[in-house]
């Protein structure tokens, strides 16, 4: 049993920021991380061309600004370098390979007990503290849908967390399942590398530029959300015109409302839409249930590879009273 006033779960950017803030106030803590490094999503599970979608002023961690030389939209490599400097500067030392299995609050002692599996030794370890900070992210584990025909599909099947770049897919027929930001950017990267790329778009999407979102985030400080949403939709229509020509449609709800209500992000376009318009990326299905049967008929698509941009899911370890 180890005791500290504060237990932080997760050594991603949020966990590191919490640790740095506690360090500055000389508050003892322990930070538990499932992977063998901090910021594993960025270091191990992100595709090469990834850039921060938001302006750097919205993304830097507290107490240490980005270098002045960094561009407005920071690359994956630059962000990882910044996090390396951040951890070194604040002398943050996570406990790695600790998978949290259970966290429970004792109403009598007013303390949290956290049980973790040491992935190195296999032993269960226990930590206790007055405060618990859950910084494990919105989603922690790759979601692979149970699609009929997927197990018998003879080609390559990758989740977006396994995808690095499209070099190996040149001249191959690749279908990307999922039209969030990861799916859209991966489709563009595949097309840039010469793959014959198709993408499944299962629901209406808002397509905005990064500059539109930057404007919207600043306007939200001064005017109501519904007015900002109206402006974002008008700007999107002005720039991207009629989406239905290319198998896409816009939701009825506004982009910022959907983020607040459902946690669904708009697609921040960094070049994918122009490739959809030029037909370099084919929108093959606008209604895609849980069935891959059609997609796997080689007479139709001659697929050689499948990339699942189906996001991640959150696995809870908090015990409910």
Tell me the role of every PLM-derived stretch.
Residues 44, 63, 171:
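Phosphate-coordinating loops and pocket residues in cytosolic domains that bind phosphorylated ligands
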Residues 58-65, 249-255:
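Short, basic/glycine-rich phosphate-binding loops at helix/coil junctions
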Residues 65-71:
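A short acidic, helix-capping loop that chelates divalent metal ions and anchors anionic groups
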């Amino acid at each position: 049993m180890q005791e500290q006033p504060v237990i932080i779960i997760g050594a991603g950017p949020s966990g590191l920021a919490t640790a740095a803030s506690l360090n500055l106030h000389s508050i003892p803590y322990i930070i538990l991380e499932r992977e063998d490094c901090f910021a594993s999503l960025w270091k191990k599970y992100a595709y090469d061309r990834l850039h921060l979608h938001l302006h750097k002023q919205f993304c830097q961690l507290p107490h240490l600004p980005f270098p002045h030389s960094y561009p407005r939209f920071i690359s994956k490599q630059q962000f990882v370098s910044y996090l390396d400097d951040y951890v070194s500067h604040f002398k943050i030392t996570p406990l790695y390979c600790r998978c949290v299995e259970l966290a429970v609050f004792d109403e009598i002692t007013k303390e949290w007990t956290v049980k973790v599996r040491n992935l190195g030794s296999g032993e269960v370890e226990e930590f206790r503290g007055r405060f618990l900070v859950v910084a494990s992210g919105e989603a922690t584990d790759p979601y692979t849908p149970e699609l009929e025909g997927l197990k018998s599909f003879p080609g390559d099947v990758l989740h977006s967390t396994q995808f690095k770049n499209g070099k190996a897919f040149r001249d191959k027929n690749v279908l990307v399942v999922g039209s969030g930001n990861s799916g859209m950017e991966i489709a563009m990267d595949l097309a840039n590398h010469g793959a014959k790329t198709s993408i499944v778009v299962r629901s209406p999407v808002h397509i905005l530029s990064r500059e539109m979102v930057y404007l919207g985030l600043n306007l939200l400080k001064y005017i109501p959300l519904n007015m900002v949403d109206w402006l974002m939709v008008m700007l999107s229509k002005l720039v991207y015109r009629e989406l239905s020509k290319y198998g896409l449609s816009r939701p009825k709800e506004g982009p910022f409302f959907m983020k607040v209500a459902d946690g669904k992000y708009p697609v921040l376009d960094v070049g994918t839409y122009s490739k959809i318009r030029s037909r370099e990326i084919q929108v093959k299905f606008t209604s895609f249930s849980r069935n891959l049967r059609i997609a796997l008929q080689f007479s139709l698509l001659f697929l050689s590879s499948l990339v699942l941009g189906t996001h991640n899911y959150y696995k809870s370890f908090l015990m409910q009273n």
